[in-house]
Amino acid sequence: NLYQFKNMIQCANKGSRSWLDYVNYGCYCGWGGSGTPVDELDRCCQTHDNCYDQAGKKGCFPKLTLYSWKCTGNVPTCNSKSGCKDFVCACDAEAAKCFAKAPYKKENFKIDTKTRC
């Protein structure tokens, strides 16, 4: 679920950046998304959005699905082995790792999505 995703983000980035820094970043981070991603981090969010869309098509509710995971050496690892739980956990874990690797550009936080996306 979204609370677990927040914790995964903080696991992967070693707590160096708040999950709130990713809300309203670029064209895809936060609720919704459209247009062309502005950078690598925004592409991580687009991929995560697409993953959640795929989960929805499988009958899952990704924003609400509780799963089992652990943080080992700043790497989120899924423990869930069942359908929706495993799928959603993988979406979140891959996104958290992607966020941790991608450069964060302050100029892409709270951009005007009407003109830039």
UniProtKB/Swiss-Prot annotation:
Its cofactor is Ca(2+). Ca(2+) binds at residues 28, 30, 32, 49. Keywords: Calcium, Disulfide bond, Hydrolase, Lipid degradation, Lipid metabolism, Metal-binding, Secreted, Toxin. Expressed by the venom gland. GO terms for biological process: arachidonate secretion; lipid catabolic process; phospholipid metabolic process. The active site is at residues 48, 92. Its EC number is 3.1.1.4. One of its GO terms (molecular function) is toxin activity. It is found in: Secreted. GO terms for cellular component: extracellular region. Binds 1 Ca(2+) ion. Coiled coil: none annotated. PLA2 catalyzes the calcium-dependent hydrolysis of the 2-acyl groups in 3-sn-phosphoglycerides. Belongs to the phospholipase A2 family. Group I subfamily. D49 sub-subfamily. This is Basic phospholipase A2 pseudexin A chain. It comes from Pseudechis porphyriacus.
